[in-house]
């Protein structure tokens, strides 16, 4: 509700300004500034009560509570009156305990002097009048509970929850219902998008099934063209059976050697015996094994080649006494028909692999075979080397699009919370905000006069962008109005804003400011740009209020102030993890605003850090090229460690003609997870690479190589707001690839 009230205030203010009602606007601003209800923000109301207690202003505290009773609590039913009275009693007791704890017994005596007439007839206050005169009230059995930290925290939480529920249940005017309508509209749009993606997937499946129905006829025609006429009507005949058939042939064919089906098939497909040795086992075992491997390639209920009709024509000349043997033969033909097609499928697969081996007898597979095989699998090439397809591949690539409106290397590329818009920033200070559904379209564009180093979407108001510069400022940019709302100066001594992270609650954001880089004082053409130690400069980590745009506090960075390269919140904003230039990961408790733990994580700088899906661990990538998982319940406990290629961790190098070389140190996110945290997207020299996490191996298993880039990818993002995940990969040539993936549900 607080968010809806805030948006409504802004809309009313904008309307009054549009109409020219400046006097009314000034009056509105004055009343909003003096608003005792704090825009229905529960945290602000509770803070106001605590502030009045801290200055011992009993009269103001009592007046403020009476105001809340008159404006808010009076709307409740009588059944909630006892709860309100208990909260009021606890509030006054909280005030009394605070006066005793701060050695202000005079304020406690003043409280009873002013409240005696009201409290002396209440049984719950009978024992409290002696409180100011006790030497050690915190040890008294009657009052010990109220002096504990647990009781104070419980009271604050109870008051907070009571006000939250009250605001949610309050009847609101019609103008405030717009927020609910917007949410319903967004939900309907999301459902429509999900249904559209499902329809797209079903259409692809129908197309695949139609291709599968056409494939057997193509395979049959191909085999009959290659094999002798009598073999095309038989499946794996034994020598004794073949002898009977030979007696029915013409004179020219009767001179042929008596061989089985496999011995006739092998020379035609140029298969080695070792490749087909499993096919010589029992028919039932072979058939069941192939069903598991190629279950998606065969269609049940189809009539196999070599049907009983063919068997009749072949054995039509047999004596009547042999009719039972003919029926047995027809059944065997039916049993072997399906196995033959499965064997042919394996033949196609092996024929595709043989040219890769580079053998002297390898032949390119005919075009109809390749097309049929690709239609059957319907999965993209797996692995960074572009190896063969695998039926267990976890994702299906539905499509890949390119956003090419940047003309220099990308630094940041982030999807907003709704998964509908993307904000991208390049090294020239060009910001682009664009959508990709249903079509790719630029929504806003801006060029910064000062260099920009960091970018972050605001969580609650996803139309706003936070932009950190290289001159010590943070800018709040409205992507819909296409203008800067405000610009704040962080620190002149720490001009580089390296990282921004907005709390999931939307009430605050953290800002990492650092002194000028060491590379600013050396030749920019030196070959060691981006090497170790270039960012070993002092830094600060600051907490700012999103609404007021004022600094709330500065975090302590032990053992000494250092530049913080990356920051990330957990899902509720209670924890903040940071990676610094000294290789240390620090975990901050955002409720106590202090560092809960820290440990040396990497040799060199920490480039990127994120919470895991269950938030029991954090992952980090460092300058040492390692991807490490850490347990946050035990400081410095390493869960797993993997080595990554140099093109996944940076610094990133783009080489050109005449010895030209462009080097870029990592700025944006280097890895991102899918919706369940089982797979990870990373950078590479030619595109994004998806790895499977949680395996027992000591190396990461590469699942999908997205490809599509001609320059090194420097930052990635993975949006899972829809059923179909969207992977973003941005490279040093300014190209951004948007790949749509469909998870392969098992």
From Swiss-Prot:
InterPro entries reported in the protein's UniProt record: ARMC9_CTLH-like_dom, WD40/YVTN_repeat-like_dom_sf, WD40_repeat_dom_sf, WD40_rpt, WDR91
GO molecular function: phosphatidylinositol 3-kinase inhibitor activity; phosphatidylinositol 3-kinase regulator activity
Comp. bias regions, Polar residues: 282-299
Locations listed in the record: Early endosome membrane; Late endosome membrane
WD repeats: 405-444, 447-487, 514-554, 559-598, 601-640, 663-701, 708-746
A biological-process GO annotation: negative regulation of phosphatidylinositol 3-kinase/protein kinase B signal transduction
GO cellular component: cytosol; early endosome membrane; endosome membrane; late endosome membrane
Region described as Disordered: spans on this chain: 265-336
SUPFAM superfamilies reported for this sequence: WD40 repeat-like
UniProt feature, compositional bias: Low complexity: 265-278
Keywords on record: Coiled coil, Endosome, Membrane, Phosphoprotein, Repeat, WD repeat
Summary of the function given for this chain in its UniProt record: Functions as a negative regulator of the PI3 kinase/PI3K activity associated with endosomal membranes via BECN1, a core subunit of the PI3K complex. By modifying the phosphatidylinositol 3-phosphate/PtdInsP3 content of endosomal membranes may regulate endosome fusion, recycling, sorting and early to late endosome transport. It is for instance, required for the delivery of cargos like BST2/tetherin from early to late endosome and thereby participates indirectly to their degradation by the lysosome. May play a role in meiosis.
Family, similarity comment: Belongs to the WD repeat WDR91 family.
Quaternary assembly: Interacts with WDR81; involved in early to late endosome cargo transport. Interacts with BECN1; negatively regulates the PI3 kinase/PI3K activity associated with endosomal membranes.
Protein name: WD repeat-containing protein 91
Annotated organism of origin: Bos taurus (Bovine)
Lineage of source species: Eukaryota, Metazoa, Chordata, Craniata, Vertebrata
